[in-house]
UniProtKB/Swiss-Prot annotation:
Keyword presence, Lyase: yes
Protein name in the entry: Probable 5-dehydro-4-deoxyglucarate dehydratase
GO BP terms, alphabetized: D-glucarate catabolic process
Entry's EC annotation: 4.2.1.41
Enzyme class, UniProt record, top EC level: lyase
Family designation: Belongs to the DapA family.
Annotated keywords: Lyase
Keyword Acetylation appears in the UniProt entry: no
Length: 301
């Protein structure tokens, strides 16, 4: 897929990132992954992110990622697949090239590992990754990888395949400056944990879409919320927030890492044998699994 086509696709609807199932031996469970991705692709997602943050990119060995991308492409039909990418520059370039070879339609460049970097370093890192591939690139503005508007503008001037900006910083003043500065040069994606909680504020800042984690196990509800948001049906959004998203947030906030583990729990409760999360994350307790089951039952009725 050409980068500009991917840019158009990204802005066309809701996005999500499937969990990565692990089998009894701890390895990638391709059969379950294909089944789950095929199910998700039957709903209205504009694109799916393979080996993204909720797909436990941080715990995957780089050589596991191409197989995950190939499996997603095989199962998703016409739904574009974007691969997670990250770590230091050399590793990120290697992952990006392998993902492109595996058939990814684009990459999401997640924050580099641990250490802070100046704007000049972030510029060089992102430019080198963009220059290494021909497919579209989205940058994820979060944690130790916060781009300022002038840095992003310089990147847009020299990287034609940089087509998306995803924000998980919550710094609305900065992201509004970025969307005002870059205009339609980029597609803007909300990327806060449980993005629906922040979707209205991000929409006002020019972010027309976001990646929904709960789409993994309640896709119909996730699509309903997105459509209500885009149609300006605030009362419907408020009802869904109160009935589902705030109770889910309460479960998610019970432990660090549950932004991923709670999603994987929901997928297991939906009937897909997604297996455990990889360390250093931990799975929900039996009590918390019961809480998730009750919440899902309340919205399934």
């Amino acid at each position: 897929m050409e980068p500009q086509d991917l840019k158009t696709v990204l802005g066309a609807g809701l996005l999500s990132f499937p969990v990565t199932p692990f089998g009894p031996d701890g390895g990638f469970n391709e059969a379950v992954y294909r089944e789950h991705v095929g199910w998700l692709a039957s709903f209205e997602a504009a694109a799916l992110f393979a080996a993204g943050g909720t797909g436990e990119f941080f715990s995957l060995a780089p050589d596991e990622i191409p197989a995950i991308v190939r499996a997603a492409k095989a199962a998703a039909g016409n739904t574009p697949i974007i691969s997670g990418c990250g770590h230091g520059t050399e590793v990120a370039i290697s992952i990006a090239k392998a993902a492109e070879k595996a058939g990814a339609d684009g990459i999401l460049l997640l924050p580099h590992y641990l250490i802070d970097a100046p704007q000049a370093g972030l510029y060089n890192h992102i430019k080198r990754v963009c220059d290494s591939i021909g497919i579209g690139v989205m940058v994820y503005n979060r944690d130790n990888s916060i781009l300022q508007a002038d840095t992003l503008k310089r990147l847009c001037d020299v990287c034609p395949n940089l087509v998306g900006f995803k924000d998980g910083s919550g710094e609305l003043g900065l992201v509004r400056q970025i969307s005002a500065t870059m205009g339609d040069r980029l597609t803007y994606l909300g990327g806060m944990p449980t993005a629906e909680l922040f979707a209205e504020a991000y929409l006002a800042a020019g972010f027309t879409t976001y990646s929904s984690a709960v789409f993994n196990f309640v896709p119909e509800l996730a699509v309903r919320f997105y459509k209500a948001l885009r149609a300006g049906r605030r009362a419907e959004c408020e009802t869904l927030l109160k009935d589902f998203f705030y109770p889910f947030m309460a479960i998610r906030n019970r432990s660090k890492g549950y932004a991923v583990a709670a999603i994987k729990a929901g997928v297991r409760l939906r009937g897909y044998d997604a297996g455990p999360v990889r360390s250093p994350l931990v799975d929900l307790t039996s009590e918390e699994m019961d809480m998730m089951a009750s919440l899902m039952a309340s919205v399934d009725r």
